[in-house]
Amino acid sequence: RGEEKLVFSLGKYGILWKHDRVSGEFKGYKETVFQNAFTDIDSVTGRVTYREDIQNAKLNEWTSACPSSAGGKDWHSMTYHEPSGLMIAPLSQTCLENAAREVALVQGGGGLAASRKFFEMPGTDGNLGKIGAYDVDTMEEVWSHQQRASFHTGTMSTGGDLVFVGDLDRRFKALNARTGEVLWETRLGTSVQGHPVSFAIDGKQYIAVTSAVGGTSPRTVPDVIATEITYPRWGNALYVFSLPEE
């Protein structure tokens, strides 16, 4: 950005990290959702101090942490909206009680080897889904859009100041990339998942997105927290949208 060459990352702890992408030098961070897994983050070096009770937990000993194993931010990509200098990310606001348990080592097996109890993140008023926009210069939150249903796609921004995203409640939305205002939405056949894409044919722009069942960690959490949100267990499809001809 400008003369600086930067790289940003955001993972399950919900912390947006900023580094020099040439030297790796730490430049700053922002907590995008409530987290209590780290007791301290050094503002100069970025070094984190992890909670000792989590590090030293014994088998069948319960600990509580935010965010849950769904994130923070899961695998869904965030988008950089260059005209406004905003990094816009899909976020998940849930927490977790967790206890390690002994499991048999079986070839081809796998799993979390833990007992889990999900709960709503404090201070969110029950909103599991959040879109957060962050100024890449100051690392401050400029706007957020929060809702009960969790988001299950990456965010995609356009040169026309739009950002597209989809959620578990089957809604595909276009927001104002500068303010977060919802400008348009439609409801698809089942939960919206994957990555919205934009493409053009003969000068006409199209927006495409997939609906699907399965997929991401945040999908399973509302099954025990937001049981009122339901969606068909079928309906995998590709949807393509465009503006009508004038």
Cite the ranges covered by each PLM segment:
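Beta-sheet-rich non-transmembrane sensory/scaffold domains
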Residues: 1-246
